Amino acid sequence: MADVSERTLQLSVLVAFASGVLLGWQANRLRRRYLDWRKRRLQDKLAATQKKLDLA
């Protein structure tokens, strides 16, 4: 097994942690944007359907 120094190990753990945080943050932002878009779209569809029902 290769001898890995303590410093390299700490650095790799830090990089892995930072990339995980960054990835999770971006994924959560995307998820929120998708949910907001879906909510807005469904509300628009509901309004259109209610308008049709009112006209009928």
Curated annotation (Swiss-Prot):
Topology of the protein relative to the lipid bilayer: Single-pass membrane protein
One GO BP: positive regulation of fatty acid beta-oxidation
Bilayer-spanning residue ranges: 10-27
A GO-annotated cellular component: mitochondrion
Broad class of where this protein is predominantly found: mitochondrion
Keywords: Membrane, Mitochondrion, Mitochondrion inner membrane, Transmembrane, Transmembrane helix
Mitochondrial intermembrane side: 28-56
Quaternary state and interactors: Interacts with mitochondrial trifunctional enzyme, a heterotetrameric complex composed of 2 HADHA subunits and 2 HADHB subunits. Interacts with cytochrome b5 reductase CYB5R3; the interaction is required to maintain cellular lipid composition and leads to stimulation of mitochondrial respiratory complex I activity. Interacts with ATP synthase subunit ATP5F1B/ATP5B.
Record protein name field: Mitoregulin
Gene name tied to this protein: MTLN
